[in-house]
């Protein structure tokens, strides 16, 4: 009888614990949503330093929040804090190695620090995950262009446009690369 009573008490405690945990989770989720909204407001107002502070608060509550890590990295990149942004993207990739947003943004940060081959490696990794990722193709084209591989770069831009005909980055970059190629070799036909 005592054993049965003990089992019932454990079940009640477990059920209460479950209810309390759910309520705490709801409160935390609401708090995280509020912090994300405040960070987004800061971004809209171009108050990037304060946005980073909100991302830090989110990460204090939830250190494995991939969205906060990526958003913080992008914001740090805007602020010109490239090494810190790469560190933030790396943390996101440790948690989610196949996160395409983290890979593309890390590649973009590497591109800004003129590490074009490393940037291309990030874009290639993103393309292994999703062959139809037009942004990875467009950014890869930019890095190839910086390395002087205009023909390959144009090919990437065209592939990006075949996937997303509204990819402005790919369209503008393709036109620019074609003009550059034409100025280098006036006899070349349009690629």
Q: Where on the chain are the PLM-derived regions?
A:
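Helix-start (N-cap) detector for alpha-helical repeat units in TPR-like alpha-solenoids
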Residues: 32, 66-67, 100-101, 134-135, ...
């Amino acid at each position: 009888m005592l054993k049965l009573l003990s089992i019932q008490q454990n079940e009640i405690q477990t059920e209460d614990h479950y209810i309390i945990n759910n309520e705490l989770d709801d409160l935390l989720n609401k708090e995280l949503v509020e912090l994300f909204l405040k960070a987004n407001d800061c971004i809209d107002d171009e108050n990037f330093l304060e946005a980073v502070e909100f991302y830090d608060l989110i990460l204090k509550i939830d250190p494995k929040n991939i969205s906060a890590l990526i958003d913080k990295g992008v914001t740090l990149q805007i602020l010109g804090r490239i090494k810190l942004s790469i560190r933030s993207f790396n943390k996101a990739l440790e948690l989610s190695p196949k996160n395409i947003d983290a890979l593309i943004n890390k590649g973009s940060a590497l591109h800004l620090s003129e590490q074009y081959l490393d940037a291309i490696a990030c874009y290639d990794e993103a393309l292994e995950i999703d062959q139809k990722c037009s942004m990875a193709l467009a950014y890869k084209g930019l890095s190839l262009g910086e390395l002087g591989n205009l023909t390959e770069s144009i090919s990437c831009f065209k592939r990006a446009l075949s996937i997303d005909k509204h990819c402005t980055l790919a369209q503008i970059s393709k036109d620019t690369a074609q003009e550059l190629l034409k100025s280098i070799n006036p006899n070349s036909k349009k690629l």
